[in-house]
């Protein structure tokens, strides 16, 4: 038997069919029985084999191996993750853009067609209506005499971009474009989801309601790992959200959650919904349950509310609000509140934080930062943000920046203050506020190698003094720092020489309170010093080509600045520079502008590099040492030490190697003039091709008064996939000085096609804690996270913790979870 094949404009579908059958001017032709406008083989649908699980046969037809020809031609964004054995392939690709109904051409085939002008008209037998971006299959299609109502029955399939449904029957109102499907099984390729509904009702072109329905993103099987069952599921393409009523969440056949209302995403837009809940136990909080709720309030702002139950403390609420304005920048506000903390003397615990950045135009920008906490233990006890740091001093600042308009000119105006959380901290250890600070830097171009530079740092420093006895050592006032420099940059492929001459000055003016508290007169209520400086940086570059490129660069650096007495000058914000290879070739011993160094020294060094043909630096090594021709008399705290009177520094060595593009090792060591090692470290990083990562580091510093604090610690971390879906990960920081692990974390993560589970244990001290203090206890916690993929956004705290502690984890984690 030959099938009839019609081609016509479709608007709406059934009305156009019967307009044609009434004798319209459209063209018709015949097609062979195997002629089809759809590329999907529907053979299995014709076999009518009833299985124990209804719909299984339908689902299996469209769930294919990723190596199949159908999957190979799909956009990879539509394919399921590597954790799935197969992927959904619907008749029409998710990337297909359907032609508007009133402009599209349709092809209709059927075994039999009958037109009745006074009654119902019919298409019967292998009916296929294939439009540009849509298709319908059925055993029979009927339309009433008024061409208002259409009915399709018998293995009915509807397909459009990435969506497919099979039903026993479809009723459709052609005028309102509303209809319903009976006993339907559906597939959403883009969401990797499928399910069943007793009724699917299309209430508008963009909204569908499923009644007595199921939903899962697991592979098709008789008992999926999880599924939603709901009295009603509403899918809205305008909002990109799905909502449910009277919903139960099943794991296998066990109901684990029942909610009257649930909201979940149906596309990749940011949308309101529940994020991954967390459940855990800690030794200082007991049982803990956290259920974050994401609120997509508008395209340019959103919020997250996080109710948190801590059995030994109480009920806490944390929140975060993010915003993006059209003309005034973007920012974030977050905080938390725990009333009557049962583990903290029934005190209210709270914090508040604000970050705002605004690029006013190409030249001006500004930002605001504000942090507040009720007590020094808040971050350690209650803050779950992995980015948070246990700082003793919380920063509050406003900054206005200027750059780019005038070449070489940058400027900054800043107001900065701090909240010192520990009320027992002495005035000496509190930071100064800058009320305000103005920074200006201007560097000219480099015509013929000649360059000029000007720097200004003007600030008013103020500190709140609790103990009047500290007024003499903690003065307030205005400090003005200026630097004028001229340098000549001589550079060739084989050598460089950079002489520089500069003059620097500090002018300090005590404020009226300091003058009165110290009883200063007009002769000593201000301090001024001017110091000229000369430096010369020279080097030779030897290069040898071949299979490997080798370079050797011997370098000499000389600096001279006369001594100017600065005894009694205040120290508002200056610290000693760290000891490293690059510091050998700098004339500045201090970070900050409260001291002007006296210098008369020569540094000698040599560096070596070896590059392979791929550009990897297989070896980089440097060694250097400074030789002093005079004692360094300007000190930070007006005290002398043996370092400032030694004739030379100890040698400093730096070495690193990219053994491969995934494996790097590095080591540094610095000695003092007496032969003692001042500091040394060793680090190695390896990132594999399969989501594995290994980091190891050791860091040791000798205590040098007024220069550096003692530190002796090792850090190690790893991420190791096991089989295809499992991976273990860990991180440890061990303090050898106190013989204690300051932090260790061990977790396991399982990723499947439709769900993920993370379980981890963590033990840690506050960064400010002294483990030897008998009143300080280690904090221990065990947490579990589960994600049902397709039900909400990701909120993986384990991943966030490791991102902030493990170099390279963010990159391998993205490649693992999104593969």
From Swiss-Prot:
GO biological process, one term: lipopolysaccharide transport
Pfam families for the chain: LptD, LptD_N
Nucleotidyltransferase in keyword set: no
InterPro entries associated with the record: LipoPS_assembly_LptD, LptD, LptD_C, OstA-like_N
Cellular compartments per GO CC: cell outer membrane; transporter complex
Compartmental location: Cell outer membrane
The entry's keywords: Cell outer membrane, Membrane, Signal
Signal peptide start and end residues: 1-33
Keyword Signal: yes
Family annotation (HAMAP family): LPS_assembly_LptD (MF_01411)
Oligomer status and interactors: Component of the lipopolysaccharide transport and assembly complex. Interacts with LptE and LptA.
Family as reported in the entry's similarity comment: Belongs to the LptD family.
Protein name as catalogued: LPS-assembly protein LptD
Species this protein is from: Acinetobacter baylyi (strain ATCC 33305 / BD413 / ADP1)
Gene: lptD
């Amino acid at each position: 038997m030959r099938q009839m094949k019609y081609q016509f404009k479709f608007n709406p579908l059934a009305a156009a069919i019967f307009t044609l059958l009434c004798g319209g001017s459209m063209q018709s032709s015949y097609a062979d029985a195997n002629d089809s406008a759809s590329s999907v083989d529907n053979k299995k649908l014709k076999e009518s084999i009833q299985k124990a699980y209804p719909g299984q046969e339908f689902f299996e037809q469209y769930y294919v191996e990723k190596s199949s020809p159908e999957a190979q031609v799909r956009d990879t964004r539509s394919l399921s993750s590597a954790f799935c054995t197969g992927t959904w392939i619907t008749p029409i690709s998710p990337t297909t853009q359907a032609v508007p109904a009133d402009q599209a051409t349709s092809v209709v085939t059927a075994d039999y067609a009958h037109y009745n002008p006074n009654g119902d008209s019919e298409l019967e037998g292998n009916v296929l209506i294939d439009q540009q971006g849509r298709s319908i299959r059925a055993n029979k299609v009927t339309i009433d005499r008024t061409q208002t109502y259409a009915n399709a029955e018998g293995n009915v399939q509807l397909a459009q971009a990435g969506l497919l449904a099979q039903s026993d029957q479809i009723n459709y109102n052609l005028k309102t474009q509303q209809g319903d499907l009976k006993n339907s099984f559906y597939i959403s390729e883009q969401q990797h989801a499928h399910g069943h509904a007793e009724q699917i009702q299309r209430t508008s072109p963009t909204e569908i309601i499923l009644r007595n329905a199921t939903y899962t993103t697991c592979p098709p099987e008789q008992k999926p790992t999880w599924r939603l069952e709901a009295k009603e599921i509403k899918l809205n393409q305008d909002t990109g959200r799905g909502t449910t009523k009277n919903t139960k969440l099943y794991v296998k056949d066990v109901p684990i959650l029942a909610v009257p209302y649930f909201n979940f995403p149906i596309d990749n837009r940011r949308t309101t919904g529940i994020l991954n809940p967390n459940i855990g136990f800690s030794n200082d909080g007991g049982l803990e349950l956290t259920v974050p709720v994401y609120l997509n309030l508008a395209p340019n702002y959103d919020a997250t509310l996080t109710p948190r139950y801590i059995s030994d403390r109480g009920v806490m609420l944390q929140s975060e609000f993010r915003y993006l304005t059209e003309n005034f920048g973007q920012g974030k506000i977050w905080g938390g509140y725990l009333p009557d903390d049962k583990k903290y003397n029934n005190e209210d615990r709270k914090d508040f934080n604000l970050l705002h950045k605004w690029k006013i135009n190409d030249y001006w920008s500004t930002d605001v930062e504000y942090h507040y906490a009720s007590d020094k233990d808040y971050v350690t006890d209650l803050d779950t943000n992995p980015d948070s740091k246990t700082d003793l001093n919380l920063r509050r600042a406003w900054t206005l920046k200027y750059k780019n308009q005038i070449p070489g000119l940058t400027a900054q105006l800043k107001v900065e203050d701090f909240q010192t959380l520990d009320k027992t901290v002495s005035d000496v250890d509190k930071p100064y506020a800058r009320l305000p600070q103005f920074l200006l830097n201007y560097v000219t171009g480099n015509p013929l190698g000649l360059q000029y530079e000007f720097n200004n740092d003007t600030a008013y420093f103020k500190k709140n003094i609790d103990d009047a006895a500290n007024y003499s050592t903690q003065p307030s006032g205005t400090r003005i720092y200026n630097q004028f420099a001229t340098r000549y940059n001589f550079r060739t492929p084989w050598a460089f020489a950079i002489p520089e001459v500069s003059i620097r000055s500090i002018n300090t003016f005590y404020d009226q309170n300091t003058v009165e508290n110290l009883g200063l007169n007009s002769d000593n209520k201000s301090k001024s010093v001017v110091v000229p400086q000369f430096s010369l940086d020279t080097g030779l570059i030897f290069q040898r080509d071949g299979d490997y490129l080798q370079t050797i660069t011997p370098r000499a650096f000389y600096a001279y600045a006369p001594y100017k007495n600065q005894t009694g000058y205040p120290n508002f914000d200056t610290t000693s520079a760290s000891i490293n290879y690059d510091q050998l070739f700098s004339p500045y011993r201090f970070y900050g502008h409260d001291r002007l160094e006296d210098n008369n020294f020569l540094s000698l060094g040599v560096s070596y590099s070896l590059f392979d043909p791929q550009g990897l630096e297989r070896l980089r090594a440097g060694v250097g040492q400074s030789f002093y021709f005079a004692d360094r008399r300007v000190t930070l705290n007006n005290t002398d030490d043996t370092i400032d009177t030694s004739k030379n520094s100890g040698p400093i060595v730096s070495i690193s190697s990219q053994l491969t593009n995934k494996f790097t090792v590095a080591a540094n060591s610095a000695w003092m003039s007496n032969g003692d090692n001042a500091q040394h470290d060793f680090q190695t990083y390896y990132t594999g091709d399969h989501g594995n990562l290994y980091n190891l580091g050791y860091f040791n510093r000798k205590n040098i008064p007024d220069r550096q604090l003692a530190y002796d610690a090792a850090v190690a971390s790893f991420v190791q996939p096991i089989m295809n879906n499992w991976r273990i990960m860990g991180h440890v920081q061990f303090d050898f000085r106190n013989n204690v692990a300051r932090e260790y974390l061990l977790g396991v993560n399982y990723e499947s096609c439709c769900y993920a589970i993370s379980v981890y244990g963590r033990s840690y001290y506050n960064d400010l804690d002294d483990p030897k203090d008998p009143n300080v206890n280690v904090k221990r916690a065990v947490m579990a996270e589960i994600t049902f993929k397709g039900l909400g956004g990701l909120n993986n705290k384990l991943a966030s913790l490791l991102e902030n502690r493990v170099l390279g984890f963010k990159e391998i984690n993205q490649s693992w979870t999104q593969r």
